[in-house]
């Protein structure tokens, strides 16, 4: 990575940095002072192993655009391919009122949806432990995958 033009998402309990192509390149879980479970920002060269990443790759991508939804911390990244296909990635960390209090879970929400053509995407979810020293183990469930880290934190990814 040659640029530090990164977008931030967060909810005061957890935060992440997202690059212009929609990859989460830095996020510590379950708190900002914890181990960086997504840490591809530290990857030295393009041929270094891809661990500590959460990337949505559009095959044949030619450009991207990124913006925040007006007056919100919700980030929208659009990726466009050479054949007219496009996807929209929406990233945020929820924060809401529950039982009369403000609740900010250690959670990132990421949606990917096609917005034009027939785009082909590849999702790479490879959390790491020890600031990228080793990948987390992967345990598959019925509609989720768990990634226990060496520090005892378990990342759970669900999908529909």
What are the residue ranges of the model-derived segments?
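Beta-sandwich/jelly-roll carbohydrate-recognition scaffolds of carbohydrate-active enzymes
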Residues: 2-160
């Amino acid at each position: 990575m040659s640029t530090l033009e990164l977008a931030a998402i967060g909810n005061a309990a957890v935060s992440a940095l997202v690059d212009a192509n929609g990859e989460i390149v830095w996020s510590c879980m379950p708190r900002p002072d914890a181990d960086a479970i997504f840490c591809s920002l530290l990857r030295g060269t393009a041929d270094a192993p891809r661990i500590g990443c959460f990337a949505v790759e559009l095959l044949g991508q030619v450009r991207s655009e990124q913006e925040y939804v007006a007056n919100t911390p919700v980030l929208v990244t659009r990726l466009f391919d050479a054949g007219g296909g496009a996807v929209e990635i929406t990233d945020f960390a929820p924060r809401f009122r529950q039982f009369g209090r403000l609740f900010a879970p250690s959670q990132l929400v990421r949606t990917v949806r096609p917005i034009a053509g027939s785009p082909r995407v590849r999702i790479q979810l490879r959390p790491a432990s020890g600031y990228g020293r080793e990948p987390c183990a992967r345990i598959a469930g019925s509609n989720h995958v768990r990634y226990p880290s060496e520090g005892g934190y378990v990342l759970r990814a669900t999908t529909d």
